[in-house]
Amino acid sequence: MLNASDRAIVKSTVPLLESGGEALTTHFYKKLLSRYPQVRPLFNQAHQASGDQPRALANGVLMYAKHIDQLEQLGGLVAKIINKHVALQILPEHYPLVGECLLEAIREVLGAEVATDEVIAAWGRAYGQLAQILIGAEEQIYEEKEQAPGGWRGAREFKVVAKVAESAEITSFYFAPADGQPILDFAAGQYIGMQLFVGGEEIRRNYSLSALAGNNQYRISVKREPGGRASNHLHDQMSVGDSINLFAPSGEFTLVDNDKPLVLISGGVGITPTLAMLEAALGTLRPIHFIHCARNGSVHAFREWVDGLAAKHPQLKRFYLYGEDDGVSPAADGVGLLDQARLEQWLPADRDLDAYFLGPKGFMAAVKRQLKAAGVPDAQARYEFFGPASALE
């Protein structure tokens, strides 16, 4: 545990982190990735280039410093971090490397006059405390997944047993275990980690599981991203019969078990976790409103599947919105952006509902504002980021 002096010193750096946190974390990542290339597979280089990863870490460091006296207030943030770490197989030996580079970055960016030996020592102990919290929580999850029926620890070999084009941009991949043994069940909304080798370089990625674990298989549905190393490798190089290493499913973007009306709102490839959520929710009696937004019909994946479910299950209402009418695809329920009036028209009359939404950041920010304006309680509007988490406000 930190003493009062350490906590006071860490909190005194909050103003500096508010103004210069992103510069600090950008410098930190350059130092970490150049000094310890073995950790490069754990980080998406596109998120480094865009600044998303440094911004997310800067926010995390700031929140930790602000709440150093009340760490229980960081429960939601810590849960997201732990699940991301587990899916990528972050291990105890990685933490000293991060700590070393973080403390050096604090000294170099803030300057020796501000980041004195006393400040660095306090931050060193604060980082050590955080590392122990994360290591302990992650080990507990690793052990639980290893001991669970069908579970495993580390990488497990799977085979691609099917590859299906779902739209002009999205392709589904079905994976079955190479050893033929059972696989770990998962909660709808979770994702799975994978190890890829692209151009001789290892990279790791997380992809949402887009269907429940039927037939002892996992399914992911991947959008081809311009310049995306992992997505283009999967689309162009991964074929039926190929082997791939997967890490056990993880994630805390999952359905709350109650009988409130359920609203699933997605934009683009954000549809993927909502498909598994929809499949799971249809096993209950709760009303479901499924709202999906796409650029046009050619890139709208899984329309026929959702339409088929809606025809069989009166509890399910589905609404589609296209940014443009391509003149070829079946018509949507509207054309344009998802605005306040349209969203309120498609929501259940009972606003004591559970909403889950996922898509591009701007889309999610708009949906969050609109749900609040429509009277949906903040705590019942839940969202997930495919990449590093950041604020939507």
Regions inferred by a protein language model and the residue ranges of each:
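Conserved beta-strand elements of the Class I
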Residues: 261-263, 356
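Globin-like tetrapyrrole-binding proteins
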Residues: 1-154, 327
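Reductase modules of NAD(P)H-dependent flavoproteins
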Residues: 72, 288-393
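A short, basic/flexible loop-to-alpha-helix module at the beginning of a structural domain
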Residues: 248-259
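Histidine-anchored nucleotide/phosphate-binding helix
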Residues: 271-282
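Short, conserved phosphate/pyrophosphate- and ester-handling motifs at nucleotide-, phospho-/glycolipid
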Residues: 189, 270, 360
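Ferredoxin-reductase
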Residues: 148-243, 261, 294-296, 307, ...
